Amino acid sequence: MARTEGDTWDIVTSVGATALVVSAMRAIEARKPEPLARDDYAQHFVAATKAEAPLFSELLEDPEAAQAPDIQLFSSYLGARTKYFDEFFLTAGNAGVRQAVILAAGLDVRGYRLPWAAGTTVYELDLPKVLEFKKQVLDEHNARATATVLDLHVDLRDDWPTVLKAAGFDPAQPTAWLAEGLLPFLPGAAQDLLFERIADLSAPGSRVAVEDFGAPGNQADRMSNAMQNEEGALQRIFKSIVEEDAPPSSLWFGDEREDPARWLTGHGWTVEATTAGELLKRYNRVPLAGEHELTDAMGQSRYFTAVLGA
């Protein structure tokens, strides 16, 4: 189904189901001999949706399927992404930041698996059905938070700053913000407003980490085309969560938007950028290059962090 301005979802439909894709890949990454990131809860999210979304469970239950080139590539890509943003939060904590905001948190469990500094509060923002599902699974497996974790049920297209401040967020204190796997799912105007709001709520010393697919027609479309064209388990998974014959990009908004790194630079933030290909080299994982359309598309995905000066 094509995206609309006020659409909504649960964990097994539309945008919500993409969080299950990420969980499945994180579970596969965690089983590798030297995982880039270890998320021991990811497999439980997949298992909890076996009846409604069997493809994800089948992937984890079939070792041969998990070894397919497309799955190994995508799990490495998401493993590198996860590690990069884990390091972002740990660096922020070492710099004295004690409040973190995970935008469109989905099935992110950093509040339960990272070694947060004492006194840290992690605010998770997402739709009610998504966060309720996550909490139910975590409770069933006796998960224990490693920080104060507050789930805030709010759509990022709505007035989320009011909800955030009502929960105790202090704009006078530095914050670590995360926008991971989020931007293509927002309309252009909502993305631009997102960064304006982040800037308005950020004290000096605040940090933001972003996965950026770039302008419409560029990286987002390359990723979508590669996922659609790469025959195998990954293609079947994405076909299961979009309309028949629709590309993965049907879940995304393709309207014009500001370049967030350029915008932040112009508003006093110092930006450092990298790509998925560079990260995989840094983490001593086989670089994404040349063998598949998917490798080239993923390798060009851009990540950046930014710090707000005094």
Curated annotation (Swiss-Prot):
Record-given protein name: Putative S-adenosyl-L-methionine-dependent methyltransferase MAB_4587c
One Gene Ontology biological process: methylation
Residues annotated as binding S-adenosyl-L-methionine: D126, D155, L156
EC numbers, comma separated: 2.1.1.-
Region forming the signal peptide: none
Enzyme's top EC category: transferase
Keywords on record: Methyltransferase, S-adenosyl-L-methionine, Transferase
Species this chain originates from: Mycobacteroides abscessus (strain ATCC 19977 / DSM 44196 / CCUG 20993 / CIP 104536 / JCM 13569 / NCTC 13031 / TMC 1543 / L948) (Mycobacterium abscessus)
